[in-house]
C-alpha cells in the first residue's frame, strides 16, 4: 500500500485485486484511490471476511469467486491496475500467475503490481515476466 501510495501518479479508475483473501489491498485502493475494485479469490469462504473488512473500512468492493485463469482479456482490458499480494506461494501457482499477467499485458492492463515475500515460486514468475516483457 505504501508502494502504491508513493508511485501512483494517475488515479486508477478500475482495479482488480487478484487472490484478494480478506481484501486489504483492494479495500485500500477503493478508499484511498477512489477506484472501482473487483476482489477475486478462489476460496468462497473468504468472501464474508472480505465484505466485513470492506464495511469496517467504509469501502465498497465487488467480490468475485474465481481463479487467476478466470480473468479473461474482456475484464483485464478494462482494468487500469491489477494487484496481487502474496499470491504465488506454491509451485502449482506459477503457471496460472504467469498466464494471468501475460493476459493482462496483452489485453492492455495499464499497470500490474504484484507483492511477495520473495518465495521461490514467485521468483520463477518474476524471471519469466522479466525475460518476456521486462519490468521492475
Model-predicted segments: where are they?
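S-adenosylmethionine-dependent methyltransferases
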Residues: 1-136
Amino acid at each position: 500500500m505504501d508502494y502504491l501510495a508513493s508511485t501512483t501518479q494517475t488515479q486508477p479508475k478500475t482495479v482488480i485485486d487478484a487472490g484478494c483473501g480478506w481484501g486489504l489491498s483492494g479495500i485500500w485502493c477503493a478508499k484511498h484511490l477512489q477506484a472501482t475494485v473487483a476482489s477475486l479469490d478462489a476460496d468462497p469462504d473468504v468472501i464474508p471476511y472480505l465484505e466485513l473488512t470492506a464495511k469496517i473500512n467504509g469501502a465498497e468492493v465487488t467480490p468475485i469467486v474465481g481463479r487467476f485463469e478466470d480473468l479473461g482479456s474482456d475484464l483485464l482490458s478494462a482494468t487500469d491496475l491489477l494487484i496481487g499480494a502474496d499470491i504465488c506461494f506454491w509451485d502449482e501457482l506459477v503457471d496460472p500467475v504467469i498466464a494471468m499477467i501475460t493476459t493482462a499485458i496483452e489485453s492492455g492492463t495499464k499497470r500490474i503490481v504484484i507483492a511477495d515475500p520473495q518465495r521461490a515460486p514467485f521468483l520463477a514468475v518474476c524471471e519469466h515476466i522479466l525475460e518476456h516483457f521486462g519490468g521492475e
